[in-house]
Amino acid sequence: MDLISSLSLGELALSFSRVPLFPVFDLSYFIVSIIYLKYEPGSVELSRRHPVASWLCAMLHCFGSYILADLLLGEPIIDYFSNSSSILLASGVWYLIFFCPLDLFYKCVCFLPVKLIFVAMKEVVRVRKIAVGIHHAHHYHHGWFIMIATGWVKGSGVALLSNLEQLLRGVWKPETNEILHMSFPTKASLYGAILFTLQQTRWLPVSKASLIFVFTMFMVSCKVFLTATHSHSSPFDVLEGYICPVLFGATWGGDHHHDNHGAPHGMGLGTQHSGLPAKAKEELSEGFRKKKTKKAD
């Protein structure tokens, strides 16, 4: 961190950490969150037939992280809805994205250069929420796992509540559980929560402002690049590909191997036979024909 101080980035990081999020950054967060809601199949039809359900889904996309964090900490889960300004702002964004004539607002905010700006600003909010979540749970003192869990859900609570949001839309897809298939923001929020927990407990000799600045730059760079290239990959995939076999004794992409074990018995037998040499296959086939002939006799 001496390098950061010598480059006068310490003051920049401190000033950056004090920038208020409301209303500009929160507005960007709401816009991107509700855009992703509109991407979901059937969401437009839902907004026409059941606008209340669509509005609830939008509020869950915007404030799901606060709801889940309050649930973990035993606080009222509707406490954040007392913030009328944020609720009205998010509701206005929802209405414009779904009901603006000719979809003008939606087309404007989805224009890629504009969308990239909103995506970058959303990541600023995400990192700040992770840091606030760690600080919020710091009264547990040595409860590291509680602090990490709180920071994690603050950063990715919307994704972790995706199954609940699907139920509000009348859809049930348990195979899309975010725990089973973590996206880049969910993984990054988890790793970020670990870093901020180490900083909060003084195991990481870095100021909170500097950590917020550095991690925000990382998140903004990665997310903007992934959005611009329309990629669903994760920058962590390469690192996890090397670490997972060492720590967990499984090759990367081991789910496919597991799926083979879960195949029907007939399919498993066919798979076993397909792995045999050609001569062994012929012997098995010949033996099967002889056995069938004896039964016929």
Curated annotation (Swiss-Prot):
It is a multi-pass membrane protein. The keyword Transmembrane helix applies. One of its GO terms (molecular function) is identical protein binding. The chain crosses the membrane at residues 19-39, 52-72, 86-106, 144-164, 178-198, 209-229, 234-254. It catalyses: K(+)(in) = K(+)(out). Residues 1-18, 73-85, 165-177, 230-233 are lumenal. InterPro entries: TRIC_channel (IPR007866). Residues 259-297 are annotated as: Disordered. Intracellular monovalent cation channel required for maintenance of rapid intracellular calcium release. Acts as a potassium counter-ion channel that functions in synchronization with calcium release from intracellular stores. Opened by a change of voltage within the sarcoplasmic reticulum lumen. Homotrimer; conformation seems to be controled by binding to diacylglycerol (DAG). This is Trimeric intracellular cation channel type A. It comes from Rattus norvegicus. The lineage of its organism: Eukaryota, Metazoa, Chordata, Craniata, Vertebrata. The gene is Tmem38a.
